[in-house]
């Protein structure tokens, strides 16, 4: 009997990509979009301008303000979840979105601990978590009482909105602290005052948590600050005792669980000179201290954030190499005449292993316009190369006087450990 071909068309299974809405169009949203592409997801972003970093790369854009409820509703419409590139959305607007049925991650109840430093300090202190000694200030004269009590240098901080050293005054004396507090209060900005910690260094413990309650922790890193801005991240933190690293990871996972965080949580820490850990700040989103994970970890913070807010199983957060160093590229006081593209060309000629991530932002003094990752095993060498590369991209000038026209292996920056010639070998040639 002859077989007869079926005339029926095989069923086609359509794929509907999960839609994640993100408030904010900066570099964090831009890099989250890059992670979403690999996962087959659709990221919609709320931006203030079509020139914002994320708007340059994603086609799904809503232009509007994060303080406009109508704009927030537009970006959230039909999304599986709404998450954040920054913490500046007014909490009362997020509560209205939740009432509309929007899945907001992290929730407004969790996010307030990253928005309001005083609320965060009070919650953590009540839970027995070590924080610097602090006080909320309603009258500048209250600073005198606090300063007398702690008998230490003091710092005045805006309760909301400060970042990268903004909204923070490392007071010279009590009078300076009073003046800054008076300025803030006159502008309607609430302030707190805290002791200036005698610290060894600053650390960051980065974790992620899903609605299911699964947690994942990356290695604890050291952050290097200059003028209030992070310039370097070393992963893992050099010479950090295992017990202290484990304690920092456990603390971050505990805070994520107790605060109900969904997504990435960065816990900024002070390591004191006597080996204690104090919580400085919280961020409930991908964080500058986690940019190393793009190249240096099995799962980047951006992919992990997407996994977490969509309640996927979380990825492996282990490092892929012994050491990764990340250097921020900051806008120079005087932008160089050489184009960014030409600077990039010269950088790759000298350092072909540099992992460059540029944000599509106009160069302005001190502005974060990109970052560079270097992977390897020698901390000192990686830090040196990262700082050289970042300064070159910022200023168009090599701080070590390197000559791109010198014909040697050094022209491509191959260190001896990677097969390049040592200085002694060069002298023998």
Curated annotation (Swiss-Prot):
Pfam families attached here?
ATP-grasp (PF02222), PurK_C (PF17769), RS_preATP-grasp-like (PF22660)
Query: Which gene name belongs to this protein?
Result: purK
Report the protein name in the record.
Answer: N5-carboxyaminoimidazole ribonucleotide synthase
Assembly mode: Homodimer.
Query: Which terms under GO biological process does the entry name?
Result: 'de novo' IMP biosynthetic process
InterPro entries in UniProt: ATP-grasp, ATP-grasp_carboxylate-amine, ATP_grasp_subdomain_1, PreATP-grasp_dom_sf, PurK, PurK_C, PurT/PurK_preATP-grasp, Rudment_hybrid_motif
HAMAP family with a match to the protein in the record = PurK
Source taxon at top rank: Bacteria
Chain intervals for the UniProt region annotation (Disordered): 406-429
Identify the enzyme class.
Answer: ligase
Family note:
Belongs to the PurK/PurT family.
Q: Which PANTHER family match?
A: PHOSPHORIBOSYLAMINOIMIDAZOLE CARBOXYLASE, PURINE BIOSYNTHESIS PROTEIN 6/7, PUR6/7
List the Gene Ontology MF annotations in alphabetical order: 5-(carboxyamino)imidazole ribonucleotide synthase activity; ATP binding; metal ion binding; phosphoribosylaminoimidazole carboxylase activity
Q: Which residues bind ATP?
A: 117, 157, 194-197, 202, 280-281
Q: Which cysteines are joined by disulfide bonds?
A: none
Please give the catalytic activity noted in the UniProt record.
Answer: 5-amino-1-(5-phospho-beta-D-ribosyl)imidazole + hydrogencarbonate + ATP = 5-carboxyamino-1-(5-phospho-D-ribosyl)imidazole + ADP + phosphate + 2 H(+)
EC numbers? 6.3.4.18
Pathway, per record: Purine metabolism; IMP biosynthesis via de novo pathway; 5-amino-1-(5-phospho-D-ribosyl)imidazole-4-carboxylate from 5-amino-1-(5-phospho-D-ribosyl)imidazole (N5-CAIR route): step 1/2
Job of this protein: Catalyzes the ATP-dependent conversion of 5-aminoimidazole ribonucleotide (AIR) and HCO(3)(-) to N5-carboxyaminoimidazole ribonucleotide (N5-CAIR).
